[in-house]
Amino acid sequence: MISTASLALLAALASGADPVAAASPAIAPRPDPIAELQAALAKLAASTPATARFSVRYENSTGEGKDQVKVAGEVSGEVSESAGGLAVRWGRAVLAQAHDEERRHAADPEVPTPTRDGLAQVQAIELANRLDAAGTLRDELAKATLVEVREEPFDGAPARLLVLKLAPALQARERRYVKELDAVGKIWLGADGIPLAAEARILGKGRIFLVIGFETEIRQAWRFARVGDRLVALRHEDERRWSGAGDRGERKSATVLELLPVTPPGP
C-alpha cells in the first residue's frame, strides 16, 4: 500500500515542485517581537483609576563662561486619572512658595524662582503618559524597526532585550535642516513579555543657511511597573544637549512617581 507521504512525493514530482520541500513538515514562522510586544501592551488599557505622588527635578543651563545662565529646582504634587479625566493637584505650600518667588522677583529680577519655574516645567500630558506608558510605547513601536533581540539580565533578573531603530517625527522645516539623524531605542522585557525598562538616544546634526551648523542629543530612560491594567513609568529621566550658532545649552529632568491607594468613590 502506498503511504500518504509517498503520494505527496509522487504528486510533487509530477508537478515539478521541490520534492524535499513537499515531504518536509511545515515550519511555523517565528513571531515578530515587535508585534508580540504590541499585543501585550494592547491588553494594558489603563481603564482602572490611578493616583500617584510625583516629584520633578530639573536643571537647565544656556551659554558658556560668564554668560552662562543656570536654573534648577524641584516641585512635588499629586496626579490622578479616572473615568472623569486627569487631575493635577499642588499643595498650598508649593503655590505659596511660587507666589512669594514671583513677588520677590518682581522687586529684583536677579532673584531666582525655582518653584515657579518648576511648576511651568510640569505638563499634564506628560504626567498622563507616565500613568499610561503602554499607550506611549505602542505609538513609538508603530514606527520602529527591529535591529536585534538578545537575552540580557536586568537588575540581576532574566530579561529579553529588544534593540530598535526609532523614527522620530520631524516637521517639514526640521527635515530640511537635519542632515544626519541617528535614533536607537532599547526595551527590556520580563518573563511575562511586559517592559521593565527602556532607553532612547537621538543624535541629530544639521545646517541652517549653509553656514550655521548645529548638533543636538537627547537621552531618555524609563523604569516601568505593571499595576492592574496599567503600565506605569515610575521614573523617567530626560537629558538634552544642543549647540549651534555660537551658543550651547543643556536641560535635565527626572520625574518620579509613587503610586498611592485609590480611594473608591462614595455612595
Predicted regions and their residues:
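Extended interaction regions within the primary functional domain
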Residues: 8-11, 88-90, 227-232
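Sec-dependent N-terminal signal peptides
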Residues: 1-18
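Structured extracytoplasmic
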Residues: 23-182, 202-214, 250-267
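Extended soluble regions of mature proteins
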Residues: 181-203, 231-237
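Short, surface-exposed charged micro-motifs
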Residues: 76-78, 184-188, 221-223
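Short aromatic loop motif centered on NTY/YTY
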Residues: 201-255
